[in-house]
């Protein structure tokens, strides 16, 4: 049985959009990370004349979200794509000739991916080391573990996992794979748990957590897509529009924070969150996975309208 799906920071996100748009306005929302469709459901219910562009790189997640939004199908346009690939040309090819006013990116990995996808995102089950968010496309985690050099493994473990045991873990992996390839999550998790002394395990966390995070980021090039996606979407956002971004770990949040702050220094953007919005105590009790979720918000001001019209006239 699958667990109940929670829309992380859903109340905060809806409140911010409500403060910036009139409830009856025909707002065009773009949900760049559809997931289970929970956030989009809030938009469709909260803004009865709105439409939602529903995007996800994973066709399985997109199908799950569409099934959840079936009662609103006339107001939803779905596009299977990574949010970093969204631009006006892509939207036009799907019959959308306007720019979104409200954009949301939820950068967290879904509960479905962790516990029900069978793609090896979690070490709690013995699953193939895959970790691809777009199934069957590109390298998988098994490729990384069994083909990357020791130095390259050490680099991604340290850079993307901030794991201080990176060198030792990389050395042991390279020696182990000479005997047998490492193909399953349980094999890798057991290997790591034997490398790090038990007394040094992080409290309440499996010692393989950081390595699994690093592998997932490497396989899916997540940080690269965040940087590229924010630039593309902020360019696409309509003047007086709002973008909200949820991040879950320090690497994501650092990119989001710096990017939004840099845009806020330019004429035409206003940072609405000097500090990130954190989930309420009530939400973290109900959904412990939300405890690390940080929400940052940027608004494109009316002063950007002249630039927006100029760029649109060039395209025409």
From Swiss-Prot:
What is the protein name for this chain? Ribosomal RNA small subunit methyltransferase H
Entry-linked Pfam families: Methyltransf_5 (PF01795)
Claim: Iron-sulfur is one of the keywords in the record: no
**Record: residues binding S-adenosyl-L-methionine:** 37-39, 56, 83, 106, 113
Q: What is its main location?
A: cytoplasm
Q: What EC number(s) has UniProt assigned to this enzyme?
A: 2.1.1.199
What's one GO BP annotation on this UniProt entry?
rRNA base methylation
Q: What does this protein do?
A: Specifically methylates the N4 position of cytidine in position 1402 (C1402) of 16S rRNA.
- Name the HAMAP family for this protein: 16SrRNA_methyltr_H
Q: Compositional bias of type Basic and acidic residues: which residue ranges?
A: 302-316
Q: Which GO CC terms are listed, alphabetically?
A: cytoplasm
Q: Which gene encodes it?
A: rsmH
Q: Which organism is it from?
A: Leptospira borgpetersenii serovar Hardjo-bovis (strain L550)
Which chemical reaction does it catalyze? cytidine(1402) in 16S rRNA + S-adenosyl-L-methionine = N(4)-methylcytidine(1402) in 16S rRNA + S-adenosyl-L-homocysteine + H(+)
Record's subcellular location:
Cytoplasm
Q: Which parts of this chain are annotated as the region Disordered? A: 276-316
A GO molecular function term, named singly, is: rRNA (cytosine-N4-)-methyltransferase activity
Q: What class of enzyme is it?
A: transferase
């Amino acid at each position: 049985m699958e667990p109940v799906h929670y829309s992380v920071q859903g109340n905060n996100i809806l409140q911010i959009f409500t403060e910036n748009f009139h409830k009856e306005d025909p707002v065009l929302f773009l949900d760049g990370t559809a997931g289970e469709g929970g956030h989009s459901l809030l938009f469709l219910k909260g803004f009865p004349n709105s439409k939602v562009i529903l995007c996800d790189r994973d066709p399985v997640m997109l199908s799950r979200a569409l099934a959840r939004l079936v009662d609103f199908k006339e107001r939803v346009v779905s596009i299977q794509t990574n949010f970093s690939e969204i631009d006006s040309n892509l939207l036009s090819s799907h019959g959308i000739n306007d720019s979104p006013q409200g954009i949301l990116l939820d950068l967290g990995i879904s509960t479905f991916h962790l516990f029900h996808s069978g793609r090896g995102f979690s070490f709690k089950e013995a699953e193939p080391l895959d970790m691809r968010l777009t199934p069957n496309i590109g390298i998988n985690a098994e490729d990384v573990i069994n083909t990357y050099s020791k130095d390259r493994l050490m680099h991604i473990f340290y850079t993307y996992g901030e794991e201080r045991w990176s060198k030792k873990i990389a050395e042991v992996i390279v020696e182990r794979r000479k005997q047998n390839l490492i193909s399953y999550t349980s094999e890798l998790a057991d290997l790591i748990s034997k490398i790090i002394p038990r007394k040094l395990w992080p409290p309440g966390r499996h010692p393989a957590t950081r390595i699994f995070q690093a592998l997932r980021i490497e396989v899916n090039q997540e940080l690269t897509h965040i940087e590229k996606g924010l630039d593309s979407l902020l360019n696409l956002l309509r003047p007086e529009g709002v973008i909200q971004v949820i991040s879950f770990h320090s690497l994501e949040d650092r990119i989001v924070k710096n990017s939004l702050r840099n845009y806020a220094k330019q004429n035409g953007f206003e940072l609405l969150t000097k500090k990130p919005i954190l989930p309420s105590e009530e939400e973290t009790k109900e959904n412990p996975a939300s405890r690390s979720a940080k929400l940052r918000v940027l608004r494109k001001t009316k002063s950007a309208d002249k630039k927006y019209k100029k760029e649109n006239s060039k395209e025409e």
